[in-house]
């Protein structure tokens, strides 16, 4: 089992952007189920680290439920657009004001 831990290299990309993991759940759910299905009791730092992605876990869950998000966007009057390395969230408040948030990665 020690051999299975050795081939776990750090992220493949030289520059690692945690926000990219939030936006691209395809790359994140692969490491997460491995950690959840193989709980190592002798790696407490890993468990501490799992808490950090758990905050993003809610984000990856929500991006996993894209139909639900689209359904909510119709009711809540907000939309998300992804263009290249930027994500734009546009929302309308009940008072009619429009709020736009753009994340550039």
Swiss-Prot record:
Residues 24-85 are annotated as: Disordered. Residues 24-38, 53-66 have a biased composition (Low complexity). This is Protein E4. It comes from Human papillomavirus 57. Residues 39-52 have a biased composition (Basic residues). GO terms for cellular component: host cell cytoplasm; host cell nucleus. Phosphorylated by host ERK. The phosphorylation triggers a structural change that enhances keratin binding and protein stability. Pfam families: Pap_E4 (PF02711). The keyword Phosphoprotein applies. It is found in: Host cytoplasm; Host nucleus. GO terms for biological process: symbiont-mediated arrest of host cell cycle during G2/M transition. It comes from the Viruses. Assembles into oligomeric complexes. Interacts with host CDK1. Interacts with host SRPK1; this interaction may favor expression of late viral transcripts. Interacts with host cytokeratin components KRT8 and KRT18. Transmembrane segments: none annotated. Keywords: Early protein, Host cytoplasm, Host G2/M cell cycle arrest by virus, Host nucleus, Host-virus interaction, Modulation of host cell cycle by virus, Phosphoprotein. Contributes to multiple aspects of the viral life cycle including viral genome amplification, suppression of suprabasal cell differentiation and egress of newly formed virions. Induces host cell cycle arrest at the G2 phase by associating with and preventing the nuclear entry of host CDK1/cyclin B1 complexes. Inhibits cellular DNA replication by preventing loading of host replication licensing proteins MCM2 and MCM7 onto chromatin. Within the cytoplasm, associates with host kinase SRPK1, a splicing factor regulator, and inhibits its activity.
């Amino acid at each position: 089992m020690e051999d299975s831990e050795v081939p776990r290299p750090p992220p493949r990309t030289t520059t690692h952007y945690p926000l990219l993991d939030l936006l691209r759940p395809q790359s994140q759910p692969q490491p997460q189920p491995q950690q959840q299905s193989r709980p190592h009791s002798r790696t407490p730092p890993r468990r501490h680290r799992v808490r950090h992605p758990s905050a993003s876990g809610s984000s990856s869950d929500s991006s996993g439920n894209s139909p639900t998000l689209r359904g909510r966007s119709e009711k809540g009057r907000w939309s998300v657009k992804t263009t290249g390395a930027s994500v734009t969230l546009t929302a309308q408040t009940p008072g009619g004001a429009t709020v736009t948030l753009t994340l550039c990665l």
